[in-house]
């Protein structure tokens, strides 16, 4: 798989761009702040419908514009597929697949399968559980695009149940049985959709675990062994290492946990149980990586998580595109060499770098120099001619 064409309209610092790409390695070179990362961000958005830098779409639209457009042509096994995404301010986003409108933007997920390495990856180890949940959910969705619908259904139920919790927090004292019966209905829906999302995550962690261990050993052979595990918000939940998750058991466990925590939830007006409270536990030896790993070990773990994702996507039978956003500058020589070795085997690698010296020596790569220019639209990014 590779991206043959990337078009941008009013995306971040790019008023207009049409980039012809191909298999092999392409390096986007330019000073920081000139718009290199925006290219990688656009490709990642096309793959996942989300940015790796911000949680909302508004910052993606260039100042003064009312929408941004990302257009890609992806080649997979000789077949071309065109995806156009319109990111709108204050209204629903739109998508077209092979120039035909689709009902939901989620229908384009899976056309471009990519793995992103970025400086923000350190948050996978040192950041909040939300960063690790997003890593799992993005990868699960790339492997099985229907997971996007599962995530959307769960998020919708979670919002509605949380709103109900806030509105009925005093119902048990007023004896309002009707309000509590309504909460029972939302408990059932949350457990149903939550169990489906948890099952997808747990199965993914089961497949990722040996790949993470192997990748970490490659990156840091002198360090402690690495391990990952799924940690649920349900008390006493332990995911089996070698068995597919039981969705029925997960649903029953969620219902029991919701019943046990209801008083606390009514007191606080928040949902305390469910996959939105779960975490991916990262361990080095017998210690958690967060808080105990050195800076180098943290980077090795973060890169190992991305390498494991690359291995899984490749094993699924479709070569993912590698997106490397200024990551070589963050790594020492050994980790840089290990990552470069993996990148050499990929069908397409798209890299950003502030200076060419950040790129591994001996790399045969096309160089695209990025500039920042004054125009009628203000200062905009441009490709040097």
From Swiss-Prot:
GO terms for molecular function: ATP binding; single-stranded DNA binding. Its main location: cytoplasm. InterPro entries: DNA-binding_RecF, DNA-binding_RecF_CS, P-loop_NTPase, RecF/RecN/SMC_N, RecF_2. CDD domains: ABC_RecF (cd03242). The keyword Cytoplasm applies. Transmembrane segments: none annotated. SUPFAM superfamilies: P-loop containing nucleoside triphosphate hydrolases. ATP binds at residues 30-37. GO terms for biological process: DNA replication; DNA synthesis involved in DNA repair; double-strand break repair; SOS response. GO terms for cellular component: cytoplasm. The keyword Ribosomal protein does not apply. It is found in: Cytoplasm. Keywords: ATP-binding, Cytoplasm, DNA damage, DNA repair, DNA replication, DNA-binding, Nucleotide-binding, SOS response. The RecF protein is involved in DNA metabolism; it is required for DNA replication and normal SOS inducibility. RecF binds preferentially to single-stranded, linear DNA. It also seems to bind ATP. Belongs to the RecF family. This is DNA replication and repair protein RecF.
